[in-house]
Amino acid sequence: MLRNSNMRWRLPLICFVWEIAMIVLFGIFVRYNDEADPHWPIFMKHENITSDIENDFYFRYPSFQDVHVMIFVGFGFLMTFLQRYGFGSVAFNFLLAAFGIQWALLMQGWFHTFVNGKILIGVESLINADFCVGSVCIAFGGVLGKVSPVQIMLMTLFQVTLFAVNEWILLNKLHVIDAGGSMTIHTFGAYFGLTVAWILSRPKLKQNNDKEGSTYISDLFSMIGTLFLWMYWPSFNSAISYHGDAQHRAAINTYCSLAACVLTTVAISSVVNKKGKLEMVHIQNATLAGGVAVGTAAEMMLTPYGSLIVGFICGIVSTLGFTYLSPILSNKLRLHDTCGIHNLHAIPGLIGGIVGAVTAACATEGVYTAEGLKKMFHFEGEYADRTPSIQGIYQAAGIGVSLAFGIVGGTVVGCILKLPIWGDPSDENCFDDDVYWELREEDEEEHLGAANQYITHLPENFKLPDRTEISFK
């Protein structure tokens, strides 16, 4: 079927209209909170604050910087493994994130910081908006190279909306703890993206798989994203934790889990290869699974050795998923997952939710102290009578709610994106920048003769049979 992928009017129209809408909505609703407002000195006196250094900006901004780098650099470069889709990977991630944070500030603001008809925003609002966009970046990985910029913008609009609703239900109604977003960010985002990818499945795509491979250089660029994500993940999981021991604990637990995950990923990658060699796709992705899985329990008394166990397990599970599960999903369920988000985010996200539920249910005053238990799980107000075992049940329920929002929401949005009016690429043009980007003549020649190609991100039966070794002079 012929597809009109020309974006000359569609993309400018949607960008202009939506940005104008953002300007209008921000003008009507959004204002600075007390700590960003010129009335801060008055607020200081009212709250008996003695120094400007107690402004939340100085406490949260370092974490915000780290999270911001993860969203725009980490996720963007992680997806550059596709040999002919580097521009789209980084720049479309940039586009969806830039739009998504604006819409997230509004959606999350209406649910959480809506006071007297206005949304009050501060540095913590910026962190939460980045978290919301993180779930969209995850979902984008499932459809990478197969959708148009307009479809990406539409997906961002709907997913941010669903994320805000799901987050509000989990945090405000179920009263769950999910500091690092194993449920709200990773489980929801991954299953939303996987469902959209399944709805948009292309049965003939495997016949045009030569563009889906990676090269030595593209894999190196992807490793840049991996390293940024890996280094800053402790900040991600602790960014919105309460001041003091909870935030300190979250960073330590994430640090330990990530470290353990690297070793088991390397070990299993070597074991499953007949020649004992390492697969770069495993090192790029599975090494991060420990950060995903420790997210929900990051603030809890998981203990350092418990964090190592979580990372140990996730390195194994994620690597085996890339090796054995991805081909099954592709061949049996027609679920083409470009970046392997099922193995990096979905399964580790579920593991993280389960770890959080069990850790919460096992909490005792002997471990936390009575005051610490109350502070950790916010057992106050209408939740003052909640016990750790009941909290564990609600934590488990949060997994189900996130799954439901991801799958049902992804189904609806996938059906909308499947309409033949959004300028998506044809099968033969998937995973190719040439469809939506103006490339120089020498760039196109490099694309046509990509040297040293070795396809690591595809199931075995998708790989090209005749790979020729090319030595560089």
Curated annotation (Swiss-Prot):
Its main location: membrane. GO terms for cellular component: apical plasma membrane; basolateral plasma membrane; plasma membrane. It is a multi-pass membrane protein. Gene3D superfamilies: Ammonium transporter AmtB like domains. Pfam families: Ammonium_transp. The keyword Glycoprotein applies. It is found in: Apical cell membrane. Keywords: Ammonia transport, Cell membrane, Glycoprotein, Membrane, Transmembrane, Transmembrane helix, Transport. Glycans are attached at residue 48. It comes from the Eukaryota. One of its GO terms (biological process) is ammonium transmembrane transport. Functions as an ammonia transporter. Belongs to the ammonium transporter (TC 2.A.49) family. Rh subfamily. This is Ammonium transporter Rh type C. The lineage of its organism: Eukaryota, Metazoa, Chordata, Craniata, Vertebrata. The gene is rhcg.
